[in-house]
Amino acid sequence: GIKVVEDGAHSIGSTYKYKGETYKCGDCQHVDLCTYSFHPVKHITTGEGGAVTTNDSDLFQRIQNLCKHGIDRRDHMFSDKERRGSWYYEMDSLGFNYRLTDFQAALGSSQLKKLPEIKRRRREIVKYYNQELSQYEELQVPFESPSVDSNFHLYLLRVRPGMKADRYDLFTGLQRLNYRPMVHYIPIHLLGYYKRNFGYKQGDFPVAEKCYQESL
């Protein structure tokens, strides 16, 4: 069957409810794999890098092999005659060098312990932002479903159409006040590579374009 991969780059620490049960994003109860990003802008970081979670032992072993050049040291890969020392290894398929360094892993482990407090603090800030910004009719603050407990990796405002100052003016005005706003994300089909290679053009995905034009 088709394997389902969850993009958990922004979701670490978040939970959701399904049929009355609470699940953590990345526990792979409804997917085969979940990928995490530990880029410096994420909730926790290893400087750079990421992780994959799965409950499938075959997928786990495949990932283990792929991240270290395809090298496999499990006993069943060798005959008794071949297996004469612990230095033996086999390479059944080619892989890559996707391993974190010890320093990166140590940083990530220490950051992971701080995740509950990081999430609590971010949710506290979001609550304050929502209270202060919801008074402006031109802005729509983030909505959280009762079935979700978000880590709020991003605080996304919708700039409603008809606002006196457009999004660009609002963006640059915030910059002048020493805030650091950002727009997430440019629709993929509007980027040059996808236009050239797949023939996409503006207007192909109007909902994505509208969300982009109104997001801050």
Task: Label the predicted regions.
Residues A9-H10, H39, E48, Q64-K68, ...:
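Histidine-centered beta-alpha loop that forms part of the nucleotide-sugar donor binding/catalytic region
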Residues E48-G49, L115:
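Short active-site oxyanion
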Residues Y36-S37, G50-N55, S109:
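Short beta-strand-to-turn element immediately C-terminal to the catalytic PLP-Schiff-base lysine
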Residues V5, V41-K42, G47, Y98-T101, ...:
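Residue-level micro-sites within transmembrane alpha helices that shape
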Residues E6-T45, W87-M91:
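Conserved active-site segment immediately N-terminal to the catalytic lysine
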